[in-house]
Amino acid sequence: GYMETTAQMAEEYPDVYFSHGTGYMSNGKNFNNYFGRIYQPRYLSGIVAGMNTKTNKIGYVAAMGSENSEVTGGIDAFALGVYSVNPSAQIYVKVTNSWYDPEAEKAAASTLLDMNCDVITQHCDTTYPQLLAQQKNVYSIGYNSDMSKDAPDACLCSVIWNWSAYYTAAVQSVIDGTWDGSNYYGGMNENLVGITQLAYCLLYTSPSPRDYAASR
């Protein structure tokens, strides 16, 4: 992103508030970073995947490799969710080395499908993994926003961001005079991240992932 540039601009314009997404810097005055506990709904989506694989092979299209803590943390949380309901399942990861690369995402998803993965999830920005899953008549789990609109017959649920939860709180803190320039790290309690409703075909045949996780 533009974290360092934003930090510099904040120093040049001390009367303006700057908030940068997905970084870590702050100055305690007029500049901070914000992000979310996306691992929380990732865990729940893992429960969904673990309950619905028949081949016990689950594919994960990842934007970055093990050097990226955001992606790695998401994979770990997803895997913990899978193994909580299906310890026999295996998770196969293919890395695209890009947050947005349609061709690489298609290739990664195709490879996972050729490996007989019957649930595909992703940490990348296009819907191609979902579309390929639908073409192959297997299940998928979306990311960023509700991808069931793109793959209605495949998408079991999506792990989603609701950035408005932070934007509203940040603007209100400026209005109230309570902004302190500290970094923000919200989660499901703050409605910053979440998981969509299960696909209609699962609504009456499976417990919700939240209910299952709460019962453990």
Q: At which residue positions do the language-model features occur?
A:
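Periplasmic-binding protein-like
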Residues: G1, S19-G21, M115-T126, Y143
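Hydrophobic alpha-helical segments within soluble ligand-binding/sensing domains
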Residues: Y34-N56, V159-W179
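An alpha-beta-alpha
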Residues: R42-A89, V93, N183-L202
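Short, well-structured alpha-helical segments in soluble
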Residues: P102-N116
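Structured C-terminal subdomain patch of bacterial secreted/periplasmic proteins
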Residues: C157-S206
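Single conserved hydrophobic/aromatic residue that forms the stacking wall/gate
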Residues: Y204-R216
